[in-house]
Each structure stands twice: as C-alpha cells, then as structure tokens.
C-alpha cells in the first residue's frame, strides 16, 4: 500500500529544535526508576511528570529527584493517570516503561496528544499493534522510538563502521540473539528483582516463538540497512520443546510443587531465519531457560571480512586469510574503526563512571537529536519491524515452521530511501 494523499511516511522525520526536552515517564517499576536515574545524567532535559499506579513507587521516584536536587515532578496515580499526563501541555517526550501489553495503547494515545514517545522493548506484541504505531506516527507526525540499547553496543557500532567503510565487503549474513539464563529470576519475587508472577513469565506460559527479538535483531537490521536500502521479506522459525524451566523448578521446589507442575508453551531455544528482499539472511535466537552463557552473538559475515562479539570479540579479514586477528592486530582494527559515538559519547560515559555505556549513548543521542532538530537514529519503522517478529515467529512455529511473510511497514518507500 502506497502513501495516501493525507498520510505520508516519516522516514527521516525532523522537528524544530527543542532547547530543553520536557519529559514524562509512565511506569515506575524497576525499569522506569532506572530510566529516571539515567535521564538525570543527560544535559538539556527536565523531568516534569511521573505516572505510576503504585503510590509507593511514585514516592521512590520523587525521592530520587529530591536527592539529585531536581524539582518535584507532577505525579499522576490511578489507572487513568497516564492519560491525564499525556493530555497536559507542558511535555515534549513521554517514556513508556510499563508491561509489554500496554506499550502500544499508551504510545498511540501519547502521539495523538501531540507528544513524541520513547518505548521500552518490545514496542508492540502483534502485527496489528505494529501498524497502529506506524499509522499513528504518520498521522500525527510524531517521533516514535523503541529504546533498543543494543544498537549502541561498542562492538556493534565498530562493525557497523567497518561495514559502512566497505572493510567487510558486501554483508551477506548476520546473526543476533538474546541468550541469558533467567531461570532463577523467573522464580524470584519482584521485591528481589525477579519475575515470579510477572507478566513476562505469564507470556512464556501462553506463547511460543521468540517473544524478545529486538536485542539481537536491532543491530543486525542496522548493518543490513533494513528499510533504508533493503527489507525483511519472510521468516521461518522453529522451537525446541520446553524442559529447562520445569527441570529447574523440580530441583528447587520439589517434584510435586506447583512450580514444577506449571506448563509452558515457550520452547527452551527458538531459532528464526529471516530472508531479505536483496538476498541477505539473518539468524535470530532466543534462549533464557538453559545454563548457556550470556550472548547476543553479534555475528557479521561479509565477502571481505567476518566479525563476532561472543563469546570473545573476533575479527577476520580477507587480507589476512581466515585466521582471526589477535593481540595488537585486533586492537589496531578495533581502534581504527571505533565509531564516533563510542569515541565521544561512550568515553564521556566512562569519565562519568556510568555503568552502562550503551544506555548512555542511546539516551544522549535521543536528546541530542531532539534538541538539534535532527531525525532520530531509530524510527517507528524500526520499532514495528523488530517487534513484529514476536507474532510471526510464533505463527511459523505453530504451523510446522512454514515461511511467514513480514509486512513492509514503509509501504514501498524503503526502495527510495538510503541511510
């Protein structure tokens, strides 16, 4: 479907500069409170409003502001408090840090109220919600960014820089993943930072496929210029059966415990293969219920080079044969192609002693672009494309791993657009 006369694409959308970005945050659980603390470190921001259904969490947030010597924010409580916050006229940007199922409804309402939105991952849970985000962003001409911090991983940025400079040749295949042993977390209480009786755990009881694709997929799509010179066309997906969560529960709680008897639809390991319009491939994995060491893979295969972050950073260049670079040779390449974001903003994060460089670079770039009237690094099409894999991977798994088409959320504009 092409753009209609009354609604056009928002690729490279830019707005007049906002000197001080006035921020509201919806959701002040663990993620929301961390978001609040992060943006107190970013110049040119003002935390104006906070919305949370649990008054105790709202009080925690106000205390964080007080201890940082910032003014108290306007607080909104109750089930409808977030709507009232979206409707106020003294906010520019709203962060949505709530459970997955509320991301899209809140984001679309905020945009309809004239606000830019930044959504925690994933931005949407199904194709219908992905289209709602795209259509609303196009109709309202508001920024809609999904906060995928893994796109700002220093190694991912280095390989992106190498690809942009042609060092890796034509990029043919990319791999990404979310591999993280969360078994103990799934049986820990929320007060302990866990997910017992948490919406994330409930999702694994009711669904299969890949419910959390964006950490691995975001950097992969950026290096392949998805919707900027190519697009994802279709996928096939398959999952193992589920055993890891049940076995862990039996050992910890006993054979006949409610935890051990709980059934899960989500397989232990999901693998999804994606084919692009220009003949490139992406392999995406999800695995949170085995003792497999943490990994996002971050594998890039080009005609002139290879790069992979996990389990240890590895680069091989055609000019050196197929032997991975080591020692000084590896450090020389990593230094030569260090992305400007890492060399400037990332180094600033280190000087400040901040614990997560990826978050700081992402946060800095978002506010920098808004303050300078620039297009954002990630747009609503990224949010839709990366999030839609949740529903589509499940559909493929449940139907014998059949190929499933991936919508073109740009309605054909990707053919005309270069990064």
Curated annotation (Swiss-Prot):
It comes from the Bacteria. Signal peptide: none annotated. Binds 1 NAD(+) per subunit. The NAD(+) cannot dissociate. Substrate binds at residues 178, 212-215, 294. Its EC number is 3.2.1.-. Its cofactor is NAD(+). The keyword Calcium does not apply. NAD(+) binds at residues 30-31, 52, 100-103, 120-121, 149, 195-199, 212. GO terms for molecular function: hydrolase activity, acting on glycosyl bonds; nucleotide binding. InterPro entries: Gfo/Idh/MocA-like_OxRdtase_N, Gfo/Idh/MocA_oxidrdct_glycsds, Glyco_hydro_109_C, NAD(P)-bd_dom_sf. Keywords: Glycosidase, Hydrolase, NAD. Glycosidase. Belongs to the Gfo/Idh/MocA family. Glycosyl hydrolase 109 subfamily. This is Glycosyl hydrolase family 109 protein 2. The lineage of its organism: Bacteria, Pseudomonadati, Bacteroidota, Bacteroidia, Bacteroidales.
